[in-house]
UniProtKB/Swiss-Prot annotation:
Keywords: Cell cycle, Cell division, Cytoplasm, Nucleus, RNA-binding. GO terms for molecular function: mRNA binding. The C-terminal part is necessary for interaction with szy-20. PANTHER family: ATAXIN 2-RELATED, ATAXIN-2 HOMOLOG. Disruption phenotype: Sterile, however growth rate, size and fat accumulation are not altered in response to a restricted diet in contrast to wild-type animals under the same conditions. RNAi-mediated knockdown results in embryonic lethality as a result of cell division defects at the one-cell stage. Cell division defects include polar body extrusion failure, abnormal spindle positioning, chromosome missegregation and cytokinesis failure. It comes from the Eukaryota. This is Ataxin-2 homolog. GO terms for cellular component: cytoplasm; cytoplasmic stress granule; nucleus. The keyword Transferase does not apply. It comes from Caenorhabditis elegans. The keyword Nucleus applies.
Length: 959
């Protein structure tokens, strides 16, 4: 097997390198120790190299840059057996000099052996040709010019222009070059000097023509210059005129006004105005409101004398007024505003040329037309106020009723000086051909009493308006006729009456009283509105007004019935600012126990939709009829327990700052949203309140004093069974957060009623509510004692029997006539002013027993209370804070100050065991914020005391 030779014997890398060397200059070393340089052209299968332009490298030609023709060979082939090695140069190796910006002669000639060499001085002469240009010719004697090489160096490094031309001439190539270069930069001029002079004269005439200049400015207008209100084009023209003062044409251009600049100094955008249509040749020109000049016939008005140039200031002011009128009329109706068309046409007209002089008789005849135009212009300037045209013509309506001068600017109208001639409105129609026409229009117009005051002014065209329309017509026009359209100008009626609404408001708004001027508007409740004067009809109940304060929240509901013989004073509404402002208000269908002639008939309570009313404040709301602010109400349904079956009205529930603890069952406190509990509790406005009133003594009866000693024995007998019944009703489990469950333990003997318990309820301990035991009198701030054996006697047998007899389950609690004893109690103790509890304060459970009148409460009179100290009353607010901290209570009623209430508290405190109650005098921490409590052992129980509340206060007060 033979070994492969040639290219197949080469590996891939060598083959790739050989392929890359094709076309490059390579150097080959042969076996005879010679070196050849040339371009590699091809490689054969036997690995033979074919080269072109081959040069043998010797020591003599090694450093030569160029090869001579004699040294080069076109093609040579080198066999593989003759090649020792081959290589090609990828990058030329250049001589590296020192890299420096500053190079000295030694660095340039570093390799030159200059040592020992003498330098020779060179002196150039004129014969060398140095210092001149290449085109310089040498003048030879005899006047002949001979081209010579200006740069005639011995080394022959360049050619002169003449040498090149001479060489071309030897080759029969003649150059057409001319030194003036006319055939390369200019064209041949056609025409003579006379033709050029005539063209310049025509150009000056065109430039002097105002129409041509106007069109040129319209085409070449600069939008940026129009936006600039400071730069004027005439400034540029004046600057150009200063440079060319010798030209009379430019001086005349300075005297003329620039048509692109308005008389008020602001540039005019003619492009937008010209695009609306070329109206310069349409219609006839008007002599009035000449803004940018008159027609060609009126150009003679402008003279060049000094007097008229000085009078241009006044003419400029007139142009400014015309500009303002034109601007006012642009946005208005252009269909029947003939003056606006004339103004717009004149705006596009060019300025007159002062240089153009009349050349024929037509220009002379136009002078008279100019004078007539000037007179018409003065007339139009006098009637400049008629330019205020409106877009639409008003309809024919009834004339306004002349009204007196009320003194207000609206009724007086504009000053008479602003009302121009012909713009004042006439109250009477102008004389017409048909005298009945004006009367017919008056009859067609509405003549109601309400619309007469607000009827717009009738538009009447008078003689001045007709004269104005005649003036708006062009003076030079003979075909145009007077405008007969109904378009009129705006006129202000000085005699127009004051504006009044056509329809009166459906619900008149009550005026705010002086003392409540900072309070929101209030409306009386329907129950407070008094009916017609006269005695009440039989069967109508008398509802004593309700004291709207939170102090009597836990009291039982009471109701008074007015006898037939009693008279009632009519009237209702806002409480007056005196001691007894509110009288009895009759209201039909009020739930509750009633005694009287109409008690046998069941009262029907009509279910009405709940209405939100802002009621006036009462005496319980604070002094000076102030409302409480910061209270937010939400509608909460609450059912009144004392109505007939299935006739339960829905009312709105009320919430107060704190949960006042009474002897009635209290519902769970309502957690109010966003109520500022930490803020000082002052006089705020109440919102969404139900009507709150209180009852005052009947007419002709004296006021009962607050403290009058112990009640009579007969009254005590009536009060004791009622108290037991009331205590039994309150013994149900409390839902207040301060309440605590019953704790078993030893306790004292409780008094037992001889009758059966009502509604099957057991007699519960009266100490279920822990916060009740801590309540004391707001006058003294100390506990009121009672004798240890102060147990009320049992009620009379008649009353016990009355309590045991229950009505049917579905019958109303007040069916039938009241017992004789109740009638006798009401007649004897009619002076005991009782308080009615509102429906929102009644406990939500419906009992089936008779609600006995509790004649143990005193009238809700505003007593002057003593200042309340810190931690005096453990009243808890809705958010768990102490409501008595900073809460002004002077002037508020407190049901705990009544003597009978103190006796009930004393009895409960004696019966309640110490293990099942809060510590005496606020020492307990259950359900009360401990921040306002005082630490310390509880004080010993006070000795039993007897007597009136005032005697107990003196006995308990420290010496």
């Amino acid at each position: 097997m033979s070994t492969p030779t040639g290219l197949p014997a080469l590996n891939g890398d060598v083959l790739s390198a050989i392929n890359d060397m094709i076309g490059r200059v390579i150097i080959i070393n042969t076996t005879d120790k010679k070196r050849y340089s040339g371009v590699l052209g091809a490689v054969s299968q036997d690995f033979d190299f074919g080269m072109q332009c081959v040069v043998e490298i010797t020591k003599e030609n090694e450093n030569n840059l160029l090869r001579t023709e004699s040294e080069c060979r076109d093609k040579m082939v080198f066999h593989y057996s003759d090649i020792v090695d081959f290589a090609y140069v990828t990058q030329e190796i250049k001589k590296q000099h020192a890299v420096s910006k500053f190079v000295t002669d030694r660095q340039y000639h570093g390799d030159t052996p200059i040592e020992g060499e003498e330098l020779q001085e060179w002196n150039g002469g004129e014969e060398d040709g140095l210092g001149g240009s290449i085109e310089d010719d040498v003048v030879v004697a005899g006047g002949q010019t001979a081209a010579r090489r200006s740069n005639n160096h011995n080394n022959g490094t360049g050619w002169s222009v003449n040498d090149m031309f001479a060489a071309n001439e030897k080759m029969n190539v003649v150059s057409t070059f001319k030194e003036d270069l006319t055939q390369y930069t200019t064209v041949e001029v056609v025409g003579t000097d006379e033709d050029r002079a005539r063209a310049e004269r025509l150009a000056r005439e065109i430039e002097s023509n105002s129409s041509s200049k106007f069109m040129a400015n319209l085409e070449n207008d600069d939008d940026e210059r129009d936006l600039d209100k400071i730069t004027r084009q005439e400034d540029f023209e004046n600057g150009n005129g200063r440079k060319r003062n010798n030209n009379s044409f430019n001086q005349q251009q300075q005297q003329r006004r620039n048509p692109n600049i308005a008389p008020n100094g602001q540039p005019v955008n003619r492009r937008a105005e010209g695009l609306r249509g070329d109206r310069r040749n349409s219609g006839s020109s008007s002599a009035n409101n000449s803004r940018y000049g008159a027609p060609a016939a009126a150009q003679q008005n402008y003279s060049q004398n000094q007097q008229q140039q000085q009078g241009q200031k006044g003419y400029r002011r007139q142009n400014e007024e015309n500009d303002w009128q034109m601007a006012k009329g642009k946005g208005q109706n252009q269909g029947h505003d003939h003056s606006f068309r004339q103004q717009q046409k004149q705006m596009l007209d060019p300025r007159p040329n002062n240089n153009v002089k009349p050349a024929d008789d037509k220009a002379q005849s136009a002078t008279t037309a100019t004078a007539a135009a000037g007179g018409s212009r003065v007339t139009d300037l006098k009637n400049w106020g008629n330019e205020f045209s409106i877009a639409t013509a008003p309809k024919d309506q009834a004339p306004a009723v002349p009204a007196g001068n009320s003194g207000s600017a609206w009724n007086r109208g504009p000053p008479s000086s602003l009302v121009a001639k012909g713009s004042s409105n006439e109250s009477t129609p102008p004389p017409t051909t048909n005298g009945e026409e004006a009367e017919t229009k008056k009859e067609e117009a509405p003549s109601t009493s309400v619309d007469v005051a607000a009827a717009p002014v009738q538009n009447v065209q008078n003689d001045a308006e007709k004269h104005q329309e005649d003036d708006n017509v062009s003076v030079t026009s003979e075909n145009d006729s007077v405008i007969t359209s109904k378009s009129s100008s705006f006129k202000f009626n000085i005699n127009a009456p004051e504006f009044k609404p056509r329809v009166a408001p459906a619900t008149p708004t009550a005026t705010t009283p002086v003392q409540n001027e900072y309070h929101p508007q209030q409306q009386p409740h329907p129950a407070m509105m008094a009916p017609q004067q006269g005695p009440p009809a039989p069967g109508m109940g008398m509802v004593p007004p309700h004291m709207g304060g939170p102090q009597n929240q836990g009291q039982p509901p009471m109701m008074m019935w007015q006898q037939t013989g009693q008279q009632q004073q009519g009237g209702g509404g806002y409480p007056q600012n005196h001691q007894f402002p509110i009288q009895h208000v009759p209201m039909q269908g009020v739930p509750g126990q009633m005694y009287g002639p109409g008690a046998a008939t069941p009262v029907t309570v009509a279910q009405q939709p709940n209405q939100q009313h802002q009621v006036p404040t009462s005496a319980a709301g604070g002094q000076n009829h102030q409302l409480r602010d910061g209270e937010y109400r939400e509608k909460q349904p609450l059912y009144m327990p004392y109505g007939p079956p299935q006739m339960v009205p829905v009312t709105s529930q009320q919430f107060y700052h704190s949960q006042y603890q009474g002897q009635m069952q209290q519902a769970a406190p309502y957690q109010m949203k966003m109520m500022p509990q930490q803020a000082p509790q002052g006089a705020y406005q109440q919102r969404y309140q139900q009507p709150q009133v209180y009852m005052m003594p009947p007419q002709g009866q004296q006021q009962q004093p607050r403290y009058q000693g112990p009640p009579p024995p007969q009254q005590q007998q009536q009060q004791q069974p009622q108290q037991q019944q009331f205590s039994g009703e309150q013994s149900r489990p409390q839902s207040h957060p301060n309440s605590q469950p019953t704790t078993p333990g030893p306790r004292g003997e409780l008094p037992k009623m001889s009758g059966a318990p009502q509604n099957g309820n057991m007699q519960a301990e009266s100490s279920s509510n822990a916060s009740h035991s801590g309540s004391t009198s707001s006058q003294s701030g100390q506990r009121s004692g009672s004798p240890p054996g102060a147990v009320p006697p049992p009620p009379p047998p008649q009353q016990q029997h009355q309590q045991q007899q229950h009505p049917p389950h579905h019958a109303p609690p007040h069916v039938g006539a009241p017992p004789p004893q109740m009638m006798q109690q009401q007649q004897q103790h009619i002076q005991q002013y009782m308080v009615m509890q509102g429906p929102h304060q009644m406990h939500p459970q419906i009992p089936n027993y008779y609600q006995q009148p509790q004649q143990v409460f005193y009238p809700m009179i505003m007593p002057q209370q003593m200042p309340m100290q810190q931690n005096q009353h453990p009243q808890q607010s809705l958010m768990g804070e102490r409501s008595d901290q900073g809460f002004p209570t002077s002037g508020y009623f407190d049901y705990r100050t009544m003597p009978n209430y103190q006796q009930q508290q004393q009895q409960q405190q004696q019966q309640m065991h110490r293990q099942n109650s809060l510590p005496q005098q606020f020492q307990g921490n259950q359900g009360v914020n401990p921040s306002g409590q005082q630490s310390g052992p509880p004080p010993p129980p006070p000795p039993s005391q007897q007597g009136t509340p005032r005697d107990q206060q003196h006995s308990q007060s420290p010496p």
